[in-house]
Structure formats: structure tokens, C-alpha cells
Amino acid sequence: MKVAFFGSPAVALPALNSLIQAGHEIKLVITQPDRPAGRGKKLTPPPVKVFARDHGLPCLQPEKIRRDEQVLEALKQAEPEVNVVVAYGQIIPASII
């Protein structure tokens, strides 16, 4: 099954990994933008982005998903059969659901 995955923190990783292990085709990963973290406020990618990069999955990081035409276009091109959302952190508009 073609899947678009929305998630950001480490808690979302088991679900994404399970989808891959079950043989589903991850067409697109959408996660939060990199944010400052730690004492030095170093720009840090969300765990889902790191996982996507390590597995060669296409990944987008919109600041505001409601206002990002690139996300809508990428979803149209990816043609997912289902969207899976696990701890994404933004309200997903009806135009995407």
C-alpha cells in the first residue's frame, strides 16, 4: 500500500518502522522543521527526519502545513492510498485528510 506518513518525535518511529517492515511503500514523510535543542540551542532534526534520511525516504518539513502549497503538490504526486499520522504536532487541514 502507498503511504504518506506524518510524524515527528521518537514515539512515531515504531509505527513508521512497522509500516516499512510490513512491506508498505512509504511515498512521503512529513515532519516538523528542525528546531533548536540542548544547552547550545543547536538546530536539531526531528527523529522521524533522521530515520527517513537513513532509509532514503522523501521528507518534507513545512513550517505551517496549512499554508504550504509544496506539501499539497508533493502529496498529489505521491498518490498515497492512505495517510498515517502519529504524533505529528500540527493540525492537518481537511484538504490533506
Which residues make up each language-model segment?
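One-carbon transfer enzymes
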Residues: 1-97
